[in-house]
């Protein structure tokens, strides 16, 4: 948990080189730290509506959660911020993340409270709760034992044996009748008797064959491959993905102040892309850079550090006033609480 103090601004693409040069001279960093992130915006799928009672404060609320990881494919590494992104001339294709190619990936899950309200606020102040986990994409082998249906075969064998028995009985009866009728059909009686013995042997062979089939149970192994995806983890956690975006920019450090200049990209579904690729477009087609300056304070109750951080941000605001205008963002747009109507 951190208490974050922040100011935001924007700068046109034509002033990007001038802004970078000024910040390099201010911070002394000739090579700023690159920013290349991919963010999932999630929402709880279980609706929670607390019962409001007079005289009681309901502090249990649901929040949207952001899941942030690195954007480190070939497109993200070779992207040039100094070149403008033209709508029809620039193709930005990124790799799909959840294909199971990466074995390991770090995710930072963030939930932020609404900024503090007040007329005399010099900067935006809000509490951010975050946790970082390491997720491994693994292949899980699910083996299901499927037992073959032997009952149908055994029933058929039993029916065959019954038919053999009936035939034997009929043949024996016919043999007795032939024997009692006279000597003229004695030869035919012997033939019937011989056929009865052959039928008896075939019946015993069928019986042994059916017993062998009953004793041997055929088992088949059906192997199903599934990937232990991060999306499945979010589903088990109780969250659904509702949006996603990509960020590309640079980061400067001035004392305890972090200065970020970046562009935001979203998915472009209007144009077709390859099967394993996602086409991106700028969230702001005017190629405007977003600027965010912030200081993280360990505790929201540390008044001394909060006052010192506010003074540092105001000094930076005064120093850069002729280049960029740092201001307080609208707190209502930073409210991440889930409201159900």
Swiss-Prot record:
Single GO MF descriptor: transcription coregulator activity
Q: Where is the composition biased (Basic and acidic residues)?
A: 163-211
Q: Which UniProt keywords apply?
A: Activator, Nucleus, Transcription, Transcription regulation
Tell me, what is an example of a GO biological process annotation in this record?
Answer: termination of RNA polymerase II transcription
**Where does the record say this protein resides?**
Nucleus
- Quote the cellular component terms of the Gene Ontology held in the record: core mediator complex; mediator complex
Which family does the UniProt entry place this protein in? Belongs to the Mediator complex subunit 18 family.
Put simply, this protein is called Mediator of RNA polymerase II transcription subunit 18
Q: What organism is the protein native to?
A: Debaryomyces hansenii (strain ATCC 36239 / CBS 767 / BCRC 21394 / JCM 1990 / NBRC 0083 / IGC 2968) (Yeast)
């Amino acid at each position: 948990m951190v208490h974050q103090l922040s100011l935001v601004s924007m700068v046109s693409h034509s002033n990007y080189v001038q802004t970078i040069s000024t910040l390099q001279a201010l911070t002394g960093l000739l090579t700023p730290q690159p920013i290349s992130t991919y963010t999932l915006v999630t929402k709880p799928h279980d609706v929670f509506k607390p019962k409001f009672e007079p005289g009681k404060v309901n502090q249990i609320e649901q929040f949207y959660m952001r899941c942030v990881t690195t954007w480190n494919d070939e497109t993200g590494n070779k992207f040039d911020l100094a070149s403008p992104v033209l709508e029809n001339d620039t193709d930005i294709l990124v790799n799909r993340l959840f294909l199971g190619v990466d074995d390991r990936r770090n995710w930072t899950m963030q939930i932020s409270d609404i900024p503090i309200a007040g007329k005399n606020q010099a900067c935006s102040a809000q509490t951010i709760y975050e946790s970082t986990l390491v997720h491994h994409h693994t292949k899980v082998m699910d083996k299901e034992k499927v037992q073959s249906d032997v009952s149908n075969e055994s029933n058929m064998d039993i029916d065959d044996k019954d038919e053999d028995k009936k035939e034997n009985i009929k043949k024996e009866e016919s043999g007795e009748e032939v024997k009692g009728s006279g000597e003229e059909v004695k030869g035919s009686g012997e033939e019937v008797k011989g056929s009865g013995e052959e039928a008896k042997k075939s019946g015993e062979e069928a019986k042994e064959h059916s017993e062998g089939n009953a004793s041997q149970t055929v088992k088949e192994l059906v192997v199903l491959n599934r990937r232990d995806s991060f999306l499945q983890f979010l589903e088990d956690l109780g969250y659904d993905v509702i949006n996603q975006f990509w960020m590309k920019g640079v980061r400067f450090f001035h004392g305890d102040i972090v200065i970020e200049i970046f562009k935001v990209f979203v998915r472009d579904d209007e144009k077709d892309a390859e099967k394993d690729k996602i086409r991106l477009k700028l969230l702001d087609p005017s190629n405007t850079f977003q600027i965010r300056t912030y200081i993280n304070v360990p505790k929201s109750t540390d008044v001394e550090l909060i006052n010192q951080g506010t003074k540092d941000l105001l000094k930076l605001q005064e120093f850069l006033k002729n280049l960029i205008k740092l201001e307080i963002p609208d707190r209502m747009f930073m409210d991440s609480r889930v409201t159900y109507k």
